[in-house]
Amino acid sequence: GTLGAAHLVEMALPHAKRMMEMGRRNYSGPVLALTDWRSRRWLARNESPYAAEIDRIAKRLDLTGAHALNVSFEWACTSAAVGPVLLRALDWPFDGLGRAVVVARHQGSAGPWLNVTWPGFVGALTGLAPGRFAAALNQAPLRYRTRVFPVDWLIERLKVSRSRAMPPAHLLRFAFETARNFDHAVAMLRDTPIALPALFSLTGPDGQAAIVERQERSAIVHKGSEVVANHWLNTEWNGRPRGIDS
């Protein structure tokens, strides 16, 4: 419906609370509490239109982790945009996540859409807007800045912490809610500033397909059938795998 992720939490409250407990088991209570605090502070000054929705979810769940898990982007995944078909594999190191997946039906200003998601998660990672487009979000490579992976990761986190642009998962949800068609979605995902690099895969109902490779304020678009994991298809941008080769 039109009530968003907060309403989904009300409909599936036990599943949402189970997600928070899975986060605690995977990351430990102290780590989750610290990242939740930092995430809450960042979202408070972020331009995301969904920050208040996350606040409502956190208040309803009354558990540590809602803010952190909503801006967590530490996953690996593979997507293929082949004509009118979007293929998606999720190989995330988050035990138990698959059992909590739901398909939620939403209504945006541009029409209805289906969100493959989890109760308590506000953004969109994989979705379908019938008659308009389907799309998925993958994590981009980590930029090469030094020869030491932890140092590069820390530099990127500090850069993200200073950004006011919306997270990529929030932009993808906004596209599903407001983009009129495939071309409109591509333009939106190509041009809207985001907080960190990302990879968007899209297909359209008339055989269209595209991969949108994004940095914070720049983009490279590949039209036609492509497969992308967590590496750049272009040869202009450098990057390193994030623990899993792709």
Locations of the language-model features?
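C-terminal, well-structured catalytic/ligand-binding subdomain of enzymes
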Residues: 1-63, 85, 89-246
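Short, glycine/charge-rich beta-strand/loop segments that flank catalytic centers
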Residues: 64-80
